[in-house]
C-alpha cells in the first residue's frame, strides 16, 4: 500500500476527536510528510499507533510523538535541540517545521547516533546535526535554543538545558520517576502539565545499553548524599562506599 496513504490515515486518526493528539495544521502537515517507515524498518506496521523497540531504545508511538510536538509548539525558523535522538524520527518531523539545519539532536548511545544519522540522510534530512553527547549537558555550541525536547524522564529539568534555552524558549520533558507527567518549562519553571506519560529514564555516561557496567545506583547515591549533606546526621557513611565512588 502507498506509504503516503498510510501516513494520511495515521494522521487522520490522530486528529480525530477520539484521540485528539494532533491539533495543529503545522504538526499534522509535518507528520503527513515524514516517511516513518524509513525509521522503523517496516512499511505498514510503521503507521500503527504503537511503539517499536530498536537498538535498545523505544521508537515512540505516533500518538505520543504528536503530544510532544504539540506541547513543543515549534515555529518556522526556530532553533531546536532534541535530547534523545533515538532513531531520528522526531528530529525529522521537527525539521519539516523549522528547517533541517535548525535541528540539533544528541544521544548518549553511539550506535543510535549512527543509526539516526543514516536514517535522517536516507529520508532526506541530512542537514540535521546529530552528535553523541550526555543529554544532561545539552549542546552548548549551538545554544541558545528556542525549543528543547527531552525524550527521557527526569525529576527536574537539567540545569544545563535550562541555561541553553533562549529567553522566550520552551522546554518539553517527561517529569517524574514512577509516575511521569509531560510538562512545559519556560525559564526555570514548569508552566504547563499535560497529563501522564511513560518514558525511559534519562541516562548519563556509563548507563547506555551497550555499556557493560551501569552506574545509576552509584550516581543516585552521590546525588542523594549531596542533597542531604546539610542534615549533618552522618547517615550517609553507613551505606555509601565513598572510597570506591
In which residue ranges do the predicted regions lie?
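N-terminal, well-ordered alpha-helical segments
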Residues: 29, 66-70, 92
